[in-house]
Amino acid sequence: MRLDDLPESGNVEDRREEGGFGGGGGGFGLPIGGGGLSIGAIVALGLIGWALGIDPSLLIGGAEILTGPSQPHVQAPPTARRTSVPQDDMGRFVSKVLGSTELQWKQVFAKDGKTYRPPVLVLYRGATHASCGGAAQSAMGPFYCPADQKVYLDTSFFDQIATRFRGCDVGSRTCQFSQAYVIAHEVGHHVQNLLGILPKAQQAQRAADSKAAANHIQVQVELQADCLAGVWANRENEMLKSEGKPPFIEPGDVEAALRTAAAIGDDTLQRRARGYVVPDSFTHGSSEQRQRWFNTGFRSGSVTSCNTFASAQL
């Protein structure tokens, strides 16, 4: 993956040096369990839960959570923070990927006469304050919070992709594109939020007559975010080529992203954690589905190809 021509974003909130819960003025726990989180509180608690030791039913898998209280328990928000462009290698990488998503989604929205308001990406280590449920913790994986329109990312998850999930080769350039896919997936949730898709999905989940039906809607949301990540990658690559610049995607990059998508599919994670698969409990989609929908967006470069809610084959 070539980073040279990607623009940097100043919408990065770097909390990595704060430790603990930045700005919270004291510790507080993540209010999970007992139906304490609604889908409106945390729409996508990232790409994983269980392989890091968290029961997914406590995060996003349970109908009792999806139909839980409409107002999550939230600690008093920290003081306003400054965003900037980080200067370390990892921070600049994240900034460049985020900057690229901003450029591409601004263009897509502008074509429809809409304004794209980019999310803020919060970098942290260990744990930090979030407006969804009170806290972000590294074991939750990356996630998007609709309440504050921020993406939360503990970059240690990138190490997990290579070492624990074996989604890419440690230290390789292709591993960077797998990491970019993770960021683009979460930004995809922000796009869904701006387009009104997430609120409609929330309403549909609350009206669902079973846990399996509510989970199915969540899978549709997640697979669409995978597809939108593919759309971003296609558009950035084609734009650079049209400008006479080398594409930012290099040989092996897409394959690495597909390996990552497969590694964090619900069936793969369930089989690894439990030894068996329960399809009705899926919340993000199978390995095959995640690969296919990312590829759908990447090959088409069109948002219209990402309508998982109307597709005959999910």
Q: PLM features: residue spans?
A:
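Pan-zinc metallopeptidase signature
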Residues: A262-L314
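Active-site recognition of the HExxH zinc-binding catalytic motif
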Residues: L47, W105, L153, Y181-L194, ...
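Short pre-active-site segment immediately N-terminal to the catalytic Zn-binding motif
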Residues: D159-V182, A213-V219
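Short helix/loop segments within enzyme catalytic domains
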Residues: R92-Y116, A213-L269
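Post-HEXXH active-site segment of zinc metalloproteases
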Residues: N193-Q218, E222
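Long amphipathic alpha-helical segments used for membrane anchoring, targeting, substrate engagement
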Residues: M1-R81
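Catalytic zinc-binding patch centered on the HExxH motif and its immediate surroundings
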Residues: A127-R164
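Extracytoplasmic
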Residues: F93, S100, Y116-P119, Q137-M140, ...
